[in-house]
């Protein structure tokens, strides 16, 4: 599922909203801001859309085992029906996620939101900066950063579950 943060929305909507990037010394204010007030409704609409059915490239039995791994290890952040805590307004500092803070530094909250997982299989590379080429790399990253201590078989099961979403 694509996501429009304020940076993307302003650039894609012809610069008709407020935008700042302290690294570049840019702080643009529009009156009225034609973008910012609409982002919550746009996000709600995007989250209401059903994900396309997953590709037939996952093993259902393995994915079911992976669902159990997910429930134990991942639901702290991926909590609602779309697999994100975004609707709760939760943001995560770069050090919580093990991500480079460069992208987060461009956002208002200087933090990352939890990406929705529905339809995840259809849009690699992963993470805000595209640094994980595969779901295996995503699982390895969070196993290391969150000290999940997953076995190789649990990781494989979790990847199959993610492919099923």
Locate each region found by the language model.
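Periplasmic c-type cytochrome electron-transfer domains
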Residues: 1-165
């Amino acid at each position: 599922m694509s996501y429009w943060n304020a940076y993307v929305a302003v650039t894609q909507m012809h610069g008709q909203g407020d935008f700042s990037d302290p690294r570049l010394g840019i702080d643009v204010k529009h009156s009225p801001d034609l973008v910012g007030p609409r982002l919550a409704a746009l996000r709600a609409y995007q989250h209401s859309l059903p994900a396309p059915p997953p590709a037939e490239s996952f093993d259902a039995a393995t994915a079911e085992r992976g669902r159990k791994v997910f429930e134990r290890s991942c639901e702290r952040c991926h909590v609602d029906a779309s697999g994100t805590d975004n609707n709760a307004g939760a943001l995560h500092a770069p050090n919580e996620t093990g991500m480079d803070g460069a992208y987060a530094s461009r956002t208002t909250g200087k933090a990352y939101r939890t990406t929705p997982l529905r339809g995840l299989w259809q849009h690699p590379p992963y993470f805000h900066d595209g640094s994980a080429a595969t779901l295996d790399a995503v699982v390895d990253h969070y196993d290391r950063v969150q000290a999940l201590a997953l076995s190789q078989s649990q990781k494989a099961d979790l990847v199959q579950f993610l492919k099923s979403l």
